[in-house]
């Protein structure tokens, strides 16, 4: 039974005294399109090839399927309150819009700039990774050695073209890529199980007792990293056909779909390598472990196909986060946190094209800075920034859970039940709070350099403070703009 809201959805759009958009974005995205973009943001093939070995090696445990089961359970509980808020906050800002609705303008403004900083870090990390991966793929197939940054520039250009246009085009591209990715991984999973794996098909990696071995907190932490991107569903609210139904369904599909896919594939991979051998294999050859399974259980051609698809997987992830950042810039431009020109919809493409172009320019400029600084694209840029971004996303989820509790706690006229407004958000707040504590405690495992680790933590904190300062300045000097921040 669908429960109708007993009060009007919060309009988090621009205040009438601020510049407004000159066109509306088309509402042409259904459950499948939005879920595809969120699933692609999680980069399933990239996670299986690149993240799975890291989960195993840092945790020193073969219990990787259990890590993903736990992460899925926590995120599923979080999704209950997250999607409930989507019915009442008519805004494309997702995390920050919900935080603002529950915790106020100042905290919400801080969350907005914090989210932008987090996703910019993700974009930079992935852009550096795909450049190196492309260069490596070319040499693997007999081509010449080429600079990674040239390929990164090319991928950014493609992203800029797709992101500039109607988002339905991006959704179609991501949908095709995602289907192929999942199909390839499923083929390998089935081949491993059909051929009996390394030591026979067993459920030994599903033994709960393994959670007491090694460093399970690190395994859970990196499992969460593999889910980053699922939250993209709510960002596309303004382009969904029926957001009150589409957003919740797409979010649950993304979380449960990714979780089951990861858990099953993780189990199959432990069967393929062997429960007793997989920690050593992941530690000794993290980049080649899964590709080696494709060679052993399927064919050399499949191994080559996976190397190519790794590029499309990471690109799909980049395109998703580009679209997420674009919607953040668009919403923040409409509110006056960023220049108002970013809050304008293109009359030609019916998309926030100016915001999209700005995201591309910011990414390009920061990557030039990376080149000038002489940072290693994988060991430093990818590793450091992906680690910091993981922490940032989980912090946003903690604040969102708290905001859900406060938002519905203030409204006695909302009859949505204890589970969706209090119990589930409370459980999510507690469990995600523990995860944040574990991430900070083990941050040195993500960023080995203590100095760099502290710098990244300070940068994250600074991005939050920027938004807080903007809100305080608005309150003191521009009351109309401050009121426009109200969710």
Language-model segment annotations:
Residues 91, 114-129, 232-239, 300-340, ...:
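Membrane-helix boundary/coupling elements in multi-pass transport proteins
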Residues 210, 342-346, 394-443:
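C-terminal membrane-solvent junction of multi-pass transporters and transport-like membrane proteins
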Residues 97-98, 104, 136-140, 256-321, ...:
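TM-loop-TM module centered on a large, flexible mid-protein loop between adjacent transmembrane helices
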Residues 51, 388-393, 419-487:
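A generic transmembrane alpha-helix motif of multi-pass inner-membrane proteins
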Residues 1-62, 76, 201-207, 473-487:
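Membrane-interface "cap" regions at the ends of multi-pass membrane proteins
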Residues 51, 76-156, 161, 314, ...:
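Hydrophobic transmembrane alpha-helices that form the core helical bundles
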Residues 20-24, 65, 141-147, 175-307:
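Helix-loop-helix junctions that connect adjacent transmembrane segments
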